[in-house]
């Protein structure tokens, strides 16, 4: 339900209508907007935008919180199983909501398979873990996923195959998965921004997948001369994803390409694309590599509270397995 935007300072019926048309239908959306974003709307000055944002933040009670309040907020985090008990264990129980989790690796390492499996598992209530006192069943009822495909690797038939082996109706999984093919970085960013529209239309989006995060940026911005522009744009995209995760309590997963690390004598010989921008914006970072046969190894190497660890899992016809 939308808020009464005329309660904001300097907002009359006409301005409220313009805000709604631009997608700003509630106080939280305005409170987390920037002055530059609001001034893109015709008739709104910088001064007026700043007043609206401050007013919305007051109404949303945004500001400092005690550690106890944040601990209570953490109890609203829910987790999604990966289908691998080892990988779930490394993650502390599963893929976390209110977080962005990155899986980087070379081609064929299994990144896209993890993304497909996550879409399937979202439709299995037994794979959703949460504190029933902090998270209502309605919060995770009829969950839906958004899959932004930048490399043309989404395969509905693979979803059907995984779902069949998991005892889930494949048609249900596909019905509850919105897929968008992004051919460039502008499309990719636009689709991510449009997810809020899907939510406002009544879709309970609980999983957002970007596969892959950096391929479009990497193709368009080549050479050192365009590196700064690329990183700024990528930073804005990551900010959008983090905002979605926080505001709507959803799981956000991204896959990432890697490049050679020529100065690496010890440790990983490859590094994820995106540099410090992605490194600071992603909550959990995994490096996935091939093992023997159908085995894969996922190494957690960055997390705010979990230790570095490795998990071995298999990719079979049935999907992700121990």
Swiss-Prot record:
InterPro entries recorded: AAA+_ATPase, DNA_recomb/repair_Rad51_C, DNA_recomb/repair_RadA, DNA_recomb/repair_RecA-like, DNA_repair_Rad51/TF_NusA_a-hlx, Hlx-hairpin-Hlx_DNA-bd_motif, P-loop_NTPase, RecA_ATP-bd
Q: What is this protein called?
A: DNA repair and recombination protein RadA
For this UniProt entry, the molecular function terms from Gene Ontology, in alphabetical order, are:
ATP binding; ATP hydrolysis activity; ATP-dependent DNA damage sensor activity; damaged DNA binding; identical protein binding
Alphabetically, which GO biological process terms does the record hold? DNA recombination; DNA repair
> Which Gene3D superfamilies does the record associate with it?
5' to 3' exonuclease, C-terminal subdomain, P-loop containing nucleotide triphosphate hydrolases
Q: What does this protein do?
A: Involved in DNA repair and in homologous recombination. Binds and assemble on single-stranded DNA to form a nucleoprotein filament. Hydrolyzes ATP in a ssDNA-dependent manner and promotes DNA strand exchange between homologous DNA molecules.
Q: Which PROSITE patterns does the record cross-reference, listed alphabetically?
A: RECA_2, RECA_3
Q: Which UniProt keywords apply?
A: ATP-binding, DNA damage, DNA recombination, DNA-binding, Nucleotide-binding
Q: Write down the NCBIfam families for this protein, in alphabetical order.
A: PRK04301.1, recomb_radA
Q: Name one Pfam family in it.
A: HHH_5
Entry similarity comment: Belongs to the eukaryotic RecA-like protein family.
The record's annotation in CDD domains points to: archRadA (cd19515)
Where does the record locate the signal sequence feature? none
> Could you say which residues bind ATP here?
105-112
Keyword Heme belongs to the record: no
